[in-house]
Amino acid sequence: MRTHYCGHVSETDLDQEVTLCGWAHRRRDHGGVIFIDLRDREGLVQVVFDPDRPETFALAERVRSEFVLKVRGRVRRRPAGTENPDLPTGQVEVLGLELDLLNPAKTPPFQLDEHEQAGEDVRLRYRYVDLRRPEMLQRLRARARITSNLRRFLDEHGFLDIETPMLTRATPEGARDYLVPSRTHPGSFFALPQSPQLFKQLLMMAGMDRYYQIVRCFRDEDLRADRQPEFTQLDIETSFMDEEGIMHLTERMMRRLFADVLQVDLPDPFPRMGYAEAMARFGSDKPDLRIPLELVEVADLMGGVEFKVFAGPAADPRGRVAALHVPGGAGLTRKQIDDYTQFVGRYGAKGLAYIKVNDPAQGREGLQSPILKFLTDEAVDGILRRTEARAGDLIFFGADKAKVVNDALGALRVKLGHDLAMVEDEWRPLWVVDFPMFEYDEKDGRLYALHHPFTAPNVDDPAELADKDPEQLVSRAYDMVLNGTELGGGSVRIHRQDMQQAVFRLLGIDEDEARAKFGFLLDALEYGAPPHGGIAFGLDRLVMLMTGASSIREVMAFPKTQTAACLLTDAPAEVDIAQLQELALRITKPQA
C-alpha cells in the first residue's frame, strides 16, 4: 500500500512520487491550502492539499485528528522560511495528488500532544491511542532493541534459548502465586511461575550447560512504581561456572548493551560492596551511589545516655542508632522536617530526631535540637566528629530495630538526595555480594531465605551449617545494582541433596514437607547434578532506567494498574457460572 514511511521522506526523494499511509496527526487550513501532518511509526511528514485538485481537496477538508489515510503525492522542498529544523522531514513536504480516507476516527479521549493533562487511568483505558505517542513508540522500540542486543550476546556465548512451563505447581516461598484451577483434576490447581528457578536448575542437571530465556513471570503482590503482577525477566543459568565467572560474563553483557544502545561506557570492572557495608553506609542493599549521603553508626556513643529512644536500641542486639549527615541541611524549615518525619513513618520509624549545626566550634551553644538536653557531651562530640558536620549542616537520627532504621534512613537518604538536587548525573553500577543466607522475621519468629532456599551457602560441608549461627551464614549470592535499582539477582545454587536438605531443615521445612513440595528436585540432585548458578534480570526495570521512564508501566505495552487491573479489557472479571461448575469451583464472597 505504501512506498515510504512518513518519517523516512527526505531530500533524496525530491520530485519523486511517494505513497504514504498513516494517521492524521494535525490538520490546518491556511489561506485556502490544507496542511495535514501525517504520522506513522517512523515519524511525521507535512502533506499539502491545494484547491487545484477539487476532489482531493474536498476529501482533505473532511479529515480530522487520527483519521487513517493513504496519500499519493510528490515530494518537494518546503518554501524558504517554512522549514522545520526540529523535524527530521522538516526540509520537505508532500504535495497531495490523491487521498484515500481508509478509516475515520472518533475524537480521541485526549490530544496526543497534551497527554500529560490526561490521567493515567484514561491513558490505560485507551492504551491503543496512548501508544501512538512518539515517546511511547520510542520506549517500545528501545525495549525491542535492548532485548535483541541481550539475545545476540547470549547466543554468541553459547547459551540456548529454552522455554519452561507456564503451568506449574505452587511454591511455598516468596510472594503469593496466581492459581489456575485444573478442569481435569478437580480441586487441584496449577500456579503461574514466579520465576523459572527450579526448571532452569533442572535444565543444568539435564546437561544443557548454558540456558537463557526472556520469560514472563507472575507474582500476586502489592504493587509499586517498579512492580507489576506480570513482568518480564532475562533468566540465565550456567553449569561449571562459579560466581566470579557469572559476574564477569553478565558485566560484559551490560557494558556492551549500554555502549550499543546509549553510547555509555560503564566501568570495567563494576565495583563491589559487601551486604553488611551497604546496609551500614546506605541503609539499603541496592544503594544509589550517585547520592553523596551516608549513614554513620553512633550506637556505641550512647553508653552514658539515659534517653531511652537512643539507649534502648543501642543496647539491643537487633537494634541500631544511626546518623544521616546532610550538608547544608540546617536551612530546612520546621515544616520540611515535619514532612520528612511523616515520610519515615511509612517505614516504621516512630520519629525523626535531628541536630542543626550552626557553629560546631561553640560546642552545644552552636547546636540547635530538641534532643540536645538528653545527650552527654561525649555523645555530642562523638557525633560531630564522626559525621564531620560543619556549620550549616543538619544531622538526622534513626533509633529502632536495625531493619526499621535501615529502611527509614535509607529511604530518607534517597529522598533528600533528590529533593536537594544532590543526585549526580551518571551511571553507577555496583555488585552487592556476601549476602546473609537467612533473615529473621520478628513477626513470625522464624528464619526465611534472603534470596531463595536453593541458594548455596559459603560452606562446603552440610555439617558446618549445624555448627554455625544461621544468621551469621553467608550465601554465594550477588545482586547487580544500578543507580539504586536492583537490575538482577543471582547466586550459585545448591547442587548436592544433603546440602539442600540441611538448608530446608534450617528453614523449618521437615523431610516430609520437603519431599511433598520439592521431591522432584531432591530426586534430580541424586542423578549427577553439576555445580551451577545463574542470575535473573528484571527487563522492565532495565528498560525503565535506560529510557528514563518514571515507572515500568511506561515501558510495557499493556500494563496493569496499581490495583492489578487492566482498564483496557476490564480484567479481572467475573466468569459464567457454567465455567465455575465445570471447574468444580464455587465463589464465596468475602464478608464485609
Curated annotation (Swiss-Prot):
The keyword Nucleotide-binding applies. The keyword Kinase does not apply. It catalyses: tRNA(Asx) + L-aspartate + ATP = L-aspartyl-tRNA(Asx) + AMP + diphosphate. One of its GO terms (molecular function) is nucleic acid binding. GO terms for biological process: aspartyl-tRNA aminoacylation. Its EC number is 6.1.1.23. L-aspartate binds at residues 173, 219, 451, 493. It is found in: Cytoplasm. It is an enzyme of class 6 (ligase). CDD domains: AspRS_core, EcAspRS_like_N. Homodimer. Belongs to the class-II aminoacyl-tRNA synthetase family. Type 1 subfamily. NCBIfam families: aspS_bact, PRK00476.1. Aspartyl-tRNA synthetase with relaxed tRNA specificity since it is able to aspartylate not only its cognate tRNA(Asp) but also tRNA(Asn). Reaction proceeds in two steps: L-aspartate is first activated by ATP to form Asp-AMP and then transferred to the acceptor end of tRNA(Asp/Asn). PANTHER family: ASPARTATE--TRNA LIGASE, MITOCHONDRIAL, ASPARTYL/LYSYL-TRNA SYNTHETASE. This is Aspartate--tRNA(Asp/Asn) ligase. It comes from Alkalilimnicola ehrlichii (strain ATCC BAA-1101 / DSM 17681 / MLHE-1). The lineage of its organism: Bacteria, Pseudomonadati, Pseudomonadota, Gammaproteobacteria, Chromatiales. The gene is aspS.
